[in-house]
């Protein structure tokens, strides 16, 4: 395996910089932010002041309140040369001319240069990941192919055609933009290590180097069975006339069950070959233009095309599996604290939905 080399902007760690790592959502952002916090002391020895664990600076920027940032820049002791903010909540919020104008002027007025970084993920894996995230959290979401169409064609959805998503930066050539490919084809595949290396921060002395992050179960995909269960659960609850919004923040009930049963090892993948070809074809031209402009290599070198590997669970396929999945759904409904008077009707609707899954002959 020969890793693909690609161009990045030269960043000098001695230059005074206000650095914002803006995610995006579902691109290792929780892992990166958590590990940066864990290494707060090591970053400080490099002259980097990390935003507080309460995300004060990120949250205030998100609310267009620049006072805390102004304070941090003017009060920064001479031991520090960088302020580092890491939050995927800023992903699209800072891609507005007025916001960048404010941040840029604020940085320059205190003798700092503004830098902004993002990880770049191939659209197929991002779509799959965001879809699962929504289903897991019981959000109203169409079928996977329709969700892909919505993202590709609806102007109000996420823009993941990168040249258009980041076009506002063309108005600010003085801002340093760093786009790191979330790719297995590069020499440093760990996102945290790739970011600190790109920021010209040397690995701390000692055998440990950078401290490891805590592994979090928070964003684990509950696997194809967990996605089926979450989706059906929301659908049945809505049919009962119970507001599915009341399930908000309870997605961990199914996620914890999925981890306990090892479902998370059999990941949901919604792409058949036709859909995969359609999505990759849709972004092909803009991806190539983006890769050539920022990395000086072809998109294919960093994100080679792989054949579809669809993995979708469509319901129990045998009588014993049906009994088992129903038993588990009873556990889930208890965990979700669905009102007792609704539970009998819930299982009537659940059983009817499972009946519609055609059992293979001979079961």
What residues fall within each predicted segment?
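Anion-recognition interface
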Residues: 1-363
């Amino acid at each position: 395996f020969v890793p693909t080399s690609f161009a990045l902007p030269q960043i000098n760690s001695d230059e005074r910089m206000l650095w914002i790592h803006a995610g995006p959502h579902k691109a290792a952002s929780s892992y990166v932010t958590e590990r940066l916090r864990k290494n707060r002391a090591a970053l400080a020895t490099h002259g980097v002041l990390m935003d507080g664990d309460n995300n004060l600076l990120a949250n205030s920027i998100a609310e267009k309140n620049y006072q805390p940032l102004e304070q941090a820049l003017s009060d920064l002791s001479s031991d520090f040369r960088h302020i580092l903010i890491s939050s995927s909540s800023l992903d699209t919020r800072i891609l507005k001319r007025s916001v960048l104008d404010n941040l840029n002027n604020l940085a320059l007025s205190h003798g700092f240069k503004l830098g902004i970084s993002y990880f770049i993920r191939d659209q197929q894996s991002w779509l799959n990941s965001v879809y699962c995230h929504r289903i897991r959290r019981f959000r109203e979401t169409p079928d996977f192919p329709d969700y892909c169409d919505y993202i590709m064609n609806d102007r109000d959805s996420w823009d993941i055609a990168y040249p258009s998503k980041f076009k506002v930066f063309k108005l600010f050539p003085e801002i340093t933009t760093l786009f790191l490919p979330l790719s297995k084809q590069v020499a440093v595949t760990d996102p945290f290590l790739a970011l600190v290396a790109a920021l010209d921060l040397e690995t701390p002395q000692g055998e440990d180097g950078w401290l490891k992050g805590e592994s979090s179960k928070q964003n684990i995909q509950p696997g194809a069975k967990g996605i089926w269960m979450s989706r059906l659960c929301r659908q049945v609850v809505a049919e009962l006339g119970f507001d599915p919004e009341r399930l908000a923040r309870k997605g961990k009930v199914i996620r914890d069950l999925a981890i306990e049963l090892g479902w998370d090892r059999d990941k949901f993948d919604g792409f058949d070959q036709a859909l995969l070809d359609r999505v990759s074809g849709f972004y092909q031209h803009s991806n190539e233009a983006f890769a050539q402009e920022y990395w000086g290599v072809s998109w294919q070198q960093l994100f080679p095309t792989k054949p579809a590997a669809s993995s979708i669970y469509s319901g129990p396929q045998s009588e014993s599996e049906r009994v088992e999945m129903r038993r588990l759904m009873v556990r889930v409904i208890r965990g979700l604290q669905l009102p007792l008077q609704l539970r009998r009707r819930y299982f009537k609707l659940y059983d009817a939905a499972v009946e519609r899954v055609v059992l293979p002959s001979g079961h």
